[in-house]
Amino acid sequence: MPVKKILIMGLPGSGKTTLARALAPKLGAVHWNADAVRAEINSHLGFSEKDRIEQARRMGWLCDQVVKAGHWAIADFVCPTKETRDAFGECITIWVDTIKEGRFEDTNKLFEPPVKYDYKVTEQNSDFWAKFLAEDLDFYEKPTFFKAILKGL
């Protein structure tokens, strides 16, 4: 079964949420925005390394529940370190790398560009990227003829 859990990550102000909002309806995905989840569910968590890792773990868990129900799940948040990305779990990672510095100096200092990612978005054009990603991800989900034959064995 293909991975249907998507992490859209990058610096604050890079266009993560805009891209997630454009991509979600194209995939029929549930979209979790980290700022909204933090405000409504995880308001007791701060921005320490430990709390950031816990926020990432919980965001990953929310997405996992959606995927278990058979749907695409998208989470958009900074996910600034390898540890936070590891805590989020296995996923398709879309790195929105459209700015060199975000709004928050502490996040700029903490942010580690990912070594591994599936897609790198380099310009703020959410309509273009959402269409491109949806088409590519939809292709990714469809079985190939070879897989269909093997599945029938």
PLM regions: where:
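NTP-dependent small-molecule kinase module
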Residues: M1, I6, A22, K26, ...
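Residue-level preference for the first positions of well-ordered beta-strands
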Residues: V3-L7, V30, W72-I74
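The conserved Walker
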Residues: P12
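Conserved lysine of the Walker
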Residues: K16
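Conserved substrate/cofactor phosphate-moiety recognition/catalytic segment
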Residues: A20-L62
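Residues at the C-termini of beta-strands that transition into short coil/loop
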Residues: D35, D97, T122-N125
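Short, charged, surface-exposed secondary-structure boundary motifs
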Residues: I41-N42, E101-F111, W129-F132
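Glycine-rich phosphate-binding loop used to anchor ATP phosphates in small-molecule kinases
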Residues: S48-F104
